[in-house]
């Protein structure tokens, strides 16, 4: 998509539209505006007892924005149950530009020096648009999601957009809403300015869980 850069991508998010590609080897980007959208209400996020235990034990070291490109690359790799990826070179270039401009963020899970999971997304106003996640070790992406929710709650976000819903996301409280409902929520979220860095760059699992359970 010639002439389509970071500024144009942000404008798409502000209109409720998001990009996707057919496959990794297809350089084209399509803009989607589905009839229904997936969200995780931040005050209704659910983490199972076993996941809370894993988070509290700090099985992984969790960081933010330490290796954005590696997280995107991890999300672009094929995995069991995800043989095809929609992340092509154009997507990687665009989101790297957004990251350099301070709008795209990553959450990384490390085991020693190895990146074993993480997620990335876009922050605009008080809305966070989750793009993709990956996991090479048990529960790594789930731990990253818990830490993301903690940051969004602490930073004053009001909308977590998951684009679509899956059974996996529904287990965390994700639900589907209509396009009109989504646009109303988005318009309200864009009025305010949230802070992705409201918490320190590295927090413990116990601190993340405390942030999630605090009354807003």
From Swiss-Prot:
Please indicate which superkingdom the organism of origin belongs to: Bacteria
Task: Cite the EC number.
Answer: 2.3.2.6
* Function of the molecule: Functions in the N-end rule pathway of protein degradation where it conjugates Leu, Phe and, less efficiently, Met from aminoacyl-tRNAs to the N-termini of proteins containing an N-terminal arginine or lysine.
**Which InterPro entries does its entry note?**
Acyl_CoA_acyltransferase, Leu/Phe-tRNA_Trfase, Leu/Phe-tRNA_Trfase_C
Q: Name one Pfam family in it.
A: Leu_Phe_trans
Q: Which reaction does it catalyse?
A: N-terminal L-lysyl-[protein] + L-leucyl-tRNA(Leu) = N-terminal L-leucyl-L-lysyl-[protein] + tRNA(Leu) + H(+); N-terminal L-arginyl-[protein] + L-leucyl-tRNA(Leu) = N-terminal L-leucyl-L-arginyl-[protein] + tRNA(Leu) + H(+); L-phenylalanyl-tRNA(Phe) + an N-terminal L-alpha-aminoacyl-[protein] = an N-terminal L-phenylalanyl-L-alpha-aminoacyl-[protein] + tRNA(Phe)
For this UniProt record, the keywords arranged alphabetically read as follows: Acyltransferase, Cytoplasm, Transferase
Q: Which GO terms describe its biological process?
A: protein catabolic process
Name assigned to this protein = Leucyl/phenylalanyl-tRNA--protein transferase
